[in-house]
Each structure stands twice: as C-alpha cells, then as structure tokens.
Curated annotation (Swiss-Prot):
GO cellular component, one term: cytoplasm
Coiled-coil region list: none
Keywords of this entry: Aminoacyl-tRNA synthetase, ATP-binding, Cytoplasm, Ligase, Nucleotide-binding, Protein biosynthesis
Species annotation: Roseiflexus sp. (strain RS-1)
Family in the record: Belongs to the class-II aminoacyl-tRNA synthetase family.
Claim: Aminoacyl-tRNA synthetase is one of the keywords in the record: yes
Lineage: superkingdom: Bacteria
Location relative to the cell: Cytoplasm
Catalyses which reaction(s): tRNA(Asn) + L-asparagine + ATP = L-asparaginyl-tRNA(Asn) + AMP + diphosphate + H(+)
Subunit structure comment from the entry: Homodimer.
Name the UniProt record assigns to this protein: Asparagine--tRNA ligase
Length: 440
C-alpha cells in the first residue's frame, strides 16, 4: 500500500479526462446543499475539488463534510477542464480518504499582527503569499548555482565554525571549542573560498552566515544565506562584469519560471524586466555629491563626510536615481574589509563595489578585488588590530603562487526581497533569526 498520489496539481493539465488521486491539505471548503467545494493544495499548486452527493457514496460525502482547514487527505476523481476554475481544471470527486482532521487552524482569513504570524511561522509558510515567496527564494538559489556551474565554477564548501574574524570583530557569535579556545560562527566563507580558488580557478561557496548585529531594520537578519564566487586572475572590472551577468541571469530565470508566484505577490515586473547589463556605475565620491544635492528627497537621509559609510537612506536615494541595479565603487579602504586591494592610482580607496537594487531594497552584493601581495596583506591585518597568527594560513595563499583575484557575495534574502517585491526581509527565509526573534 502507498499513500503517494498518482498525480500532482502542477501537472494536472496532462491528466485531463483521467481519474487521478491527489494528496494534500484543505485550503478552503464551502458547502452548498448537495455540493461540497474543496480547495486542495499539495505543495505544487491548488485545485478545486467538487463533491456532488448524487455521484458519491454517503461515506464519501460525509468525509467531505467532515474536512476542516488544513486537514490532510487523499482525493480521487476525474480531471475536468473548466476555464472558470483556479488553474483551469477541477476534480470531480468520487472518493476521499481522510488522513487527519485538523483542529481549528490558528491562522484565519483575517488580519493578524506581525508578532502573531511570526510566532506561528511554522504554519504561516503554508499561506499562498509566503509559499510564493519561498518558491521564488528556491528558484533564485537554483538559478544562481546552475548559472555558476554552467560557467565552469566549482562549488567549494567552507566551514561554519572558524577560529577568527573575516569581516571585523564587533559582530561575531562566539562559542567555546573544547580545549582549543573560542570558535566563531562564520561571517562569510570568503577567506576559505579563496583557498579553493587557488586550487580550482573558479569556485563558489553557498551556506549560512552569521552577524551579531544589534539591528532591527527591515534589511537585517542575524543568520542569512550567501553565495560567494571567487575567480583567479580576475581584476575589479572583470568582477563587476561577472556580477552584472550573474544578477541578470537570475532575474530573467525567475521571470520565466515563477511568473505565477510573482503574480500571487502582485509584483510589478517592469523594473525586473529592465535588469539587463550594463548596470550604471558611480564612485563613492560621486555618491556623496548626489547625497549632498538630493538628501531632502528621502526621509532620514543626511549628507555624509568623506570616510563615512552609506546607510539605508543613502542607498535608497542613490538607487532611486537609476532604473536598474547600480554599482557604487571605490569606497574608502578604512571602512571596508582588510583584504580589499587598494586602487593603485589612489591607495586610500579600495577596488570594491556594492551593488544596490532599485526600489529602495539597498545593497544585494558586496565585492572586491583581493589583496594578493603577502606583505601588504599582513600589514593590513595588523592595521585592523587583528592577530596575524590567526591568519597565517590566509597569508600563505599569497606566498605560494599568488595571483590577482576577485570575488563577491550575494545575500539570498536581500535578493529575494527585491525580486519578490516584499517589504521586510523576515519573510524571505523560512525561519528568520533577528535581534528579538529566535522562535520557532
């Protein structure tokens, strides 16, 4: 005996006129005399199942009446095309097998507060919009990895437990590590993926990263996922060109394959359709001038002194001036990570860039050319107040066959928020971890 279905809702069009068995959960139910209308979801889609009392046994009709929201069941019936039905097909039911009758479902078709929904996140992800968001997230991840694989990149997995910081020491999660001292949850896989790059040439890592930032903004999570490519012999300009192609390919893939989910979210796709290379580029200095001239256009946006980093309002302002993602490049070295290559024409700035998404979504990618001179790297590590002994293996990469190289990291959740058009990053990951949120 098997409980597996003989068809899925997403492929129901291939079974028109056939009798199939679906397995899933009840989304909605309406009773009208001798008719019971059941909307069933199976994870791949939703279909309306029609139970007509005259065509089924009393036991089957009673089972239909007994079903509640989120009850699990197997429903057998004939597939019938109907232009009026959701998805264009209905199921004329002839048998129902109840697996479980669910008690009253906590999430009702009414307005619920954010805290309530987050407390019930394990159930909220079943709703149509959350389902669509997470489908888009999954498509972005698949598109990113498949595109990189097609370009000759090798996936290179990096450790989550690390002995030292990669992005600064102020936002580390620390944990005792047996007799070896303290371990830290990885802020990025980049340092380790550089080792892989020296072996394979073109690599990427994909996994969770952790930042102990006490921030409550709509753009921040303490645990998020990053995909981080690294390329040997790539200079700064090569890195920007790679990012353009990468982001554009992902967006086009989502537009092609997840149109229904974008429609569920009522996402205006016109801004996404404009996401084709080349992306505009401005320098940090040019960004400061724009902010000085236009800061009144965005609430909370104030002029910056040279050497100050861009905040969310500044990113929103700059991105609003362009119709597609925009690079802000050549930031002051002092406000960026220690491993970034200085501009040979102007050493006080780094060969780096942030890619800002339009419509107020802010930075989705950060990248740079990396320092490849071991003496310069060691000097920068000391300047940042870090323990050189912790980074000897990283400096070693430059001692044995060092080459110029570049890479970047794209945050999956920020990219999902932008592409899906959702306001808050907490809805772009199944179970968000934030300053005041660690349940469920």
């Amino acid at each position: 005996m098997s409980l597996l279905p003989t068809a899925t809702i997403s492929t129901i069009a291939h079974h028109n006129g056939e009798v199939v068995t679906l397995a899933g959960w009840v989304v909605h139910k309406t009773e009208k005399g001798k008719l019971v209308f059941i909307r069933l979801r199976d994870g791949s889609g939703v279909i309306q199942c029609v139970v007509f009392r005259n065509n089924v046994t009393e036991a089957t009709f009673a089972a239909a009446q007994q079903l509640t929201i989120e009850s699990s069941c197997r429903i057998t019936g004939a597939v019938r095309a109907d232009a009026r039905a959701p998805g264009g097909f209905e199921l004329d039911v002839n048998a129902i097998e109840i697996i479980q009758i669910a008690p009253e479902y906590p999430i009702q078709p009414k307005e619920h507060g954010v805290e309530f929904l987050m407390e019930h996140r394990h159930l909220w992800i079943r709703s149509s919009k959350q389902h669509a968001l997470l489908r888009i997230r999954a498509e972005i991840i698949a598109a990113a990895q498949e595109w990189l694989n097609d370009q000759g990149f090798v996936r290179f997995d990096t450790p989550i437990l690390t002995p030292c910081a990669a992005e600064g020491t102020t936002n580390l999660f620390a944990t005792p590590y047996f007799d070896l001292g303290t371990a830290y949850l990885g802020q990025t896989g980049q340092l380790y993926v550089e080792a892989g790059m020296m072996s394979f040439g073109k690599v990427y890592c994909f996994g969770p990263t952790f930042r102990a930032e006490k921030s409550k903004t709509r753009r921040h999570l303490t645990e998020f996922w990053m995909i981080e490519p690294e390329v040997a012999f790539a200079l700064h300009e090569d890195n920007l060109a790679l990012q353009e192609r990468f982001v554009s390919a992902i967006v086009q893939r989502v537009l092609e394959r997840r149109a229904d989910d974008l429609a569920t979210l009522e996402r205006d796709t016109k801004p996404l359709e404009r996401c084709v290379p080349p992306f505009p580029r401005i320098t940090y200095d040019e960004a400061l001038k724009l902010i000085a001239e236009r800061h009144a256009d965005v609430e909370g946006c104030t002029p910056l002194e040279w050497g100050e980093d861009l905040g969310a309002p500044h990113e929103t302002l700059i991105a609003s001036l362009f119709d597609r993602p925009v690079f802000v490049e050549r930031f002051p070295s002092a406000i960026k990570a220690f491993y970034m290559e200085p501009d040979p024409q102007r050493p006080e700035v780094a060969l780096c860039a942030d890619l800002l998404a339009p419509e107020g979504y802010g930075e989705i990618i950060g990248g740079s050319q990396r320092i490849h001179d071991p003496a310069l790297l060691e000097r920068r590590i000391r300047e940042y107040g870090l323990n050189v002994d912790d980074y000897q293996w990283y400096i070693d990469l430059r001692r044995y066959g060092s080459v110029p190289h570049s890479g970047f990291g794209m945050g999956i959740e920020r990219a999902t928020a932008w592409i899906a058009g959702t306001h808050h990053i907490r809805e772009t990951i199944p179970f968000p971890r934030m300053l005041y949120r660690m349940y469920p």
